[in-house]
Structures are given as C-alpha cells and as structure tokens.
Amino acid sequence: MIDLSHKKIIVTFLMHLGDLVLTTPFIHALRKAAPTADITYLVDEKLKDVVLHNPYIDHVWTIDKKGRDNHLRALWAMGQKITDGKFDVLINLHPNERCSFIDAVARVPVKVGASHFLFRGFFDPCIKLDRTLHAADMYLDVLTRLGVTHLEHRGLEVFPGKADYQKAEAFWQGAGLSPETGLVGFNIGSAVETKRWAPERFAAVADTLKEEGYETVFFGGPMDREMVEAAISKMKTKPLVATGKFSIGELAAAMSRCQL
C-alpha cells in the first residue's frame, strides 16, 4: 500500500471529454483517502473546465496536446515541470502515449498507474486497467490496487463556476423558459462514429417528450452542429438549440437545469 497522506500528488490524464468526466469519482475518492494531500491534475487544456472548479483538486495543470504542445519538446518540458514541482507521487490513469512519455521523463519518487508498453519500466507498480469494468470503476480500481480500501465518492461530478451559471441562466431567460418548465437535454455527439445513435431516433424521442409536455434542448460543441441539424430536420416539433453556444463549464451549468 502506498501512503498518500501529506503527500504532494500529481494525477495525469490526457484523454477525451467524456473520459475525463469519468475520472471524477477517482478524484473524489483520492481526496477522501488523502485529505491532507496536495493534489494536482494534468489534463488537456481545451477540457480544463471539467475540473477547474473541482473542490477536491488543489491545482490544475494543462497541456494543449493537439495544438501548440503537439510536439516532443513540449511534452519533454512538461515532464521537467513535473520534476521541478517536487511531487512525491505520480498517478497516471491511462496508457496514452503522450502521458506515458511525460511521466517517464518526470523524476518523481513514486510513479504508479497505467502506461504505454514502451514506458512500463518507469512505473512501479505499472497497472493494467481492468477493461471489464465500467470506465469510472476502472479508474477507481487503480486506487484499490494501490491499497485504498474505502472508495468514497458521489458519482460523476462537474463543478461549473459562477460565470458559467450566469451565462446559462441568460440563455434560458432569452429562450423564454420559466423555472417551472420541464426540460430534457440531448447531447448527441461522439468523437467515435460507432458510438453515435441514428439522428432519426433522437428526433423521435425528442418529439415524444415534447408531446408529453417537456421542452427539449440540443447541446453539443461546434463539431456537433451537423449531427444536431440532421436530427432536428427529422423532428415534427421545435426544440431549443444550444449547440456550439457554451464552453464546457457553461454547458455543465446549463445541463444542471435539465430534469433529464
């Protein structure tokens, strides 16, 4: 078992939006297991809103993995930054090659977690993720295998900031939505095409909900506009459209208004 108390810990994870949300139970459980630790989370810069206001994290570090930092020198520099941060424990949650390289470069007394096969020798223990588990449980399982016996958490959590709630409320007011109105949100995009449901099926569900007395709203980022337009074109009723109008933090705030 690794002693996490009073330690300076960095967690590294450079995967997609949904994957990052799925690590939030891990972060909550880590904080409960190590209430006196100083916890830093390294994430993709464009996704930082997912964890920026998380009360279980002390510091958020970012790297623009597909933008200005998409080169070996930047990854090496982040490894050096971690070294300079004088962390006691590094935990990597995914065998992503970028994270694994950064972590291999970094000099930290205890490096544990998942790793790309080329860098497994830098981790002790190197943990193979149990992909038979739900993804959120798979990340929690890393703590279990490090000796944490009580995994206290509240499921998936995103904490928007005050400005995020203000932007969301302005949108709902502009749409003429009263606080009493039932609202169901749709976030239909996916970076993986095989995970996408057919647009006409979303349209049919949205129409049914509208007939049941609910307002419907389509969320998503700018890259989801084409999918949303395809679904809306097949609807008989008219939904609200918030696609591409919110940052990640604002989206989380807006979604908190939905009953489903």
Residue ranges and their predicted role:
Residues 1-260:
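Catalytic machinery of carbohydrate-active enzymes
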